[in-house]
Amino acid sequence: MPRKIEEIKDFLLTARRKDAKSVKIKKNKDNVKFKVRCSRYLYTLVITDKEKAEKLKQSLPPGLAVKELK
């Protein structure tokens, strides 16, 4: 079941949760989507700024499996 997250801080808190399994990063020409899989929901954050997306990618938790998609 999908859920949308609007704020970067909320996304980082969700990514640090114990039930967060993996993060998928989808890059389009317009935006970058970060999708974190938790036990119940798939949380999605959409970022239109490429520099913010790179910063967020660097600040993801180290134990989380990160997969980049086109």
Swiss-Prot record:
GO cellular component: cytoplasm; cytosol; cytosolic large ribosomal subunit; cytosolic ribosome; eukaryotic 80S initiation complex; focal adhesion; postsynaptic density
Keywords: Acetylation, Cytoplasm, Isopeptide bond, Ribonucleoprotein, Ribosomal protein, Ubl conjugation
Biological process annotations from GO: 90S preribosome assembly; axial mesoderm development; cytoplasmic translation; middle ear morphogenesis; ossification; protein-RNA complex assembly; regulation of translation; sensory perception of sound
Subcellular location, principal: cytoplasm
Record-level Gene Ontology MF annotations: RNA binding; structural constituent of ribosome
Cited Gene3D superfamilies: 3.30.720.90
Localisation per UniProt entry: Cytoplasm
Keyword Transferase included in the entry's annotation: no
Similarity annotation: Belongs to the eukaryotic ribosomal protein eL38 family.
Function of the molecule: Component of the large ribosomal subunit. The ribosome is a large ribonucleoprotein complex responsible for the synthesis of proteins in the cell.
Name of the molecule in the record: Large ribosomal subunit protein eL38
Protein encoded by which gene: RPL38
